[in-house]
């Protein structure tokens, strides 16, 4: 699933190709991707309008329209956007939504798994899925002290905790593994056992790693592509994710893979030891 760096990379590419181009037609080839509007009404609302800006919240893409509406897109597992110039040939298979512009070019939403979603809103406050999202590590409101407070009230493993989009938004399985490795935290550590200093280090690494991944245009492990024939580059910098049975870059011990709450997790047992918080209370 595309995570914060991949979604940001997609948005950066879209901004270069589709802003301020009048829409002539929106063609929906698979009805189920529209969650709160039918294809005919979507076409009516977008026809003759244009995208004035494109923003991100967590892993969501938000298209701002010239008529004040908001089109909210989530790529889910395999969603991709491909821009096509007028007259260009492309494979129509798996193109679920087509945004046709009046200059003959078009933006295609491509999704082999068909899990992606679209919502249209008059106001973003109506988008419940956005309202429940926490700050992401690149936002000004991201505060390790607030994360620590949430951790103190949680009985989950740290890997599961940081994947919760109501705790930290934008992080998925790939970057969770990398952030925990950089922070020397075992993914099975109970999060309420982490000290505030450990949470601070984790949050700083989250910001650092996600920012670097954006510079590298995301991570391509299986299929991520931000435009035709272009893939990300951060996979070349991964330390543990997908590295099962390969030597750790720090200590040379072999990286292990284990399912944690249903998610394949990669880590180094030597560099990422489970520790418990030492009590500062005096013995009676």
Curated annotation (Swiss-Prot):
Keywords linked to the UniProt accession: DNA damage, DNA repair, DNA-binding, Glycosidase, Hydrolase, Lyase, Metal-binding, Multifunctional enzyme, Zinc, Zinc-finger
Record text on cofactor binding: Binds 1 zinc ion per subunit.
A GO molecular-function descriptor: 8-oxo-7,8-dihydroguanine DNA N-glycosylase activity
InterPro entries: DNA_glyclase/AP_lyase_DNA-bd (IPR015886), DNA_glyclase_Znf_dom_DNA_BS (IPR015887), Formamido-pyr_DNA_Glyclase (IPR020629), FPG_cat (IPR012319), MutM-like_N-ter (IPR035937), Ribosomal_uS13-like_H2TH (IPR010979), Znf_DNA_glyclase/AP_lyase (IPR000214), Znf_FPG/IleRS (IPR010663)
Cofactor(s) for this UniProt protein: Zn(2+)
GO biological process per UniProt: base-excision repair
Active site: 2-3, 59, 263
SMART domains reported in the protein's UniProt record: Fapy_DNA_glyco, H2TH
Record CDD domains: EcFpg-like_N (cd08966)
ZnF (FPG-type) intervals: 239-273
Catalyzed reaction equations: Hydrolysis of DNA containing ring-opened 7-methylguanine residues, releasing 2,6-diamino-4-hydroxy-5-(N-methyl)formamidopyrimidine; 2'-deoxyribonucleotide-(2'-deoxyribose 5'-phosphate)-2'-deoxyribonucleotide-DNA = a 3'-end 2'-deoxyribonucleotide-(2,3-dehydro-2,3-deoxyribose 5'-phosphate)-DNA + a 5'-end 5'-phospho-2'-deoxyribonucleoside-DNA + H(+)
Keyword check for Lyase: yes
EC number: 3.2.2.23, 4.2.99.18
Binding positions (DNA): 94, 113
Assigned protein family: Belongs to the FPG family.
Function: Involved in base excision repair of DNA damaged by oxidation or by mutagenic agents. Acts as a DNA glycosylase that recognizes and removes damaged bases. Has a preference for oxidized purines, such as 7,8-dihydro-8-oxoguanine (8-oxoG). Has AP (apurinic/apyrimidinic) lyase activity and introduces nicks in the DNA strand. Cleaves the DNA backbone by beta-delta elimination to generate a single-strand break at the site of the removed base with both 3'- and 5'-phosphates.
Subunit structure: Monomer.
HAMAP family the UniProt entry points to: Fapy_DNA_glycosyl
Listed name of the protein: Formamidopyrimidine-DNA glycosylase
Annotated source species: Mycoplasma genitalium (strain ATCC 33530 / DSM 19775 / NCTC 10195 / G37) (Mycoplasmoides genitalium)
Lineage: Bacteria, Bacillati, Mycoplasmatota, Mycoplasmoidales, Mycoplasmoidaceae
């Amino acid at each position: 699933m595309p995570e914060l760096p991949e979604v940001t990379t997609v948005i950066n590419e879209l901004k270069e190709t589709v802003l301020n181009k009048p829409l002539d037609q929106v063609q929906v080839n698979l009805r189920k991707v529209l969650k709160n509007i039918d294809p005919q009404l979507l076409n009516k609302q977008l026809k003759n309008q244009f995208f004035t800006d494109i923003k991100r919240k967590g892993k969501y893409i938000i298209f701002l329209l010239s008529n004040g509406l908001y089109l909210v897109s989530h790529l889910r597992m395999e969603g991709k956007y491909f821009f096509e110039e007028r007259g260009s040939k492309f494979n129509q298979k798996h193109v679920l939504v087509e945004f046709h512009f009046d200059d003959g070019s078009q933006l295609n939403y491509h999704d082999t798994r068909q899990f992606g979603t679209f919502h249209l809103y008059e106001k973003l406050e109506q988008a419940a899925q956005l309202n429940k999202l926490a700050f992401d590590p690149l936002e000004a409101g991201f505060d390790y002290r607030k994360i620590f407070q949430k951790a103190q009230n949680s009985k989950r493993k740290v890997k599961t905790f940081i994947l919760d989009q109501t705790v930290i938004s934008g992080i998925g399985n790939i970057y969770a593994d990398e952030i925990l490795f950089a922070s020397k935290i075992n993914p099975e550590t109970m999060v309420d056992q982490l000290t505030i200093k450990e949470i601070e280090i984790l949050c700083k690494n989250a910001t650092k790693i996600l920012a670097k991944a954006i510079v590298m245009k995301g991570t391509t492990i299986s299929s991520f592509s931000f435009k035709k024939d272009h893939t990300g580059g951060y996979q070349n910098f991964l330390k543990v994710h997908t590295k099962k049975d390969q030597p750790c870059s720090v200590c040379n011990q072999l990286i292990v893979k284990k399912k944690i709450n249903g998610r394949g997790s990669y880590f180094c047992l030597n560099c990422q030891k489970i520790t418990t918080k030492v009590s500062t209370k005096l013995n009676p």
